[in-house]
């Protein structure tokens, strides 16, 4: 089956949404489970990250609905779409930081691609939102 531009655009948006949710969950997981000498600083940083990311998820869902798209809304769908690897273990604090840095860079790239597609589609309001999400991830990468 061949996809048209809208299909690719819509799939990219859903992938970004699922990846953003997975990223927020990972940051929250690390916030809850961080241990070690830098616990206070990392506990606070991870909370800041997941709050910054999670704050945009509802708006992102509303943006998708404005395009008449249904948002992925189950862990099964998230796992099928996300580009952020799940973390089933509790890594050491250095690995937590490294993972979130790498994932934040990945998310900035995902949002950049979606931004460009939104601009090409004339969805300038959504493009602005996606640029803001990209900036948040650049801050943490």
What is each stretch, according to the model?
Residues 19, 65-73, 103-106, 110:
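Alpha-helix capping/hinge segments and adjacent helical runs
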Residues 12, 58, 62, 81-132:
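Acidic/histidine-rich alpha-helical segments that form the ligand environment
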Residues 38-77:
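Conserved alpha-helical segments that form or flank metal/cofactor-binding pockets of metalloenzymes
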Residues 2-8, 23-48, 110-125:
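Helix-loop segments that flank and shape redox-cofactor active sites
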Residues 1-16, 93:
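Disorder-to-helix initiation segments
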């Amino acid at each position: 089956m061949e996809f048209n531009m809208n299909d690719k655009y819509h799939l990219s948006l859903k992938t970004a949404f699922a990846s953003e949710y997975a990223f927020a969950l990972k940051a929250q997981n690390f916030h809850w489970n961080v241990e070690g000498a830098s616990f206070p600083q990392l506990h606070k940083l991870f909370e800041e990250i997941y709050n910054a990311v999670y704050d945009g998820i509802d708006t992102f869902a509303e943006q998708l609905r404005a395009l008449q798209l249904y948002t992925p809304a189950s862990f099964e769908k998230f796992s099928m779409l996300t580009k952020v690897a799940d973390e089933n273990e509790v890594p050491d604090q250095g690995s937590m930081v490294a993972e979130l840095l790498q994932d934040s860079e990945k998310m900035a790239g995902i949002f950049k691609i979606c931004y460009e597609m939104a601009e090409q589609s004339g969805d300038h309001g959504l493009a602005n939102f996606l640029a803001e999400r990209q900036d948040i991830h650049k801050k943490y990468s």
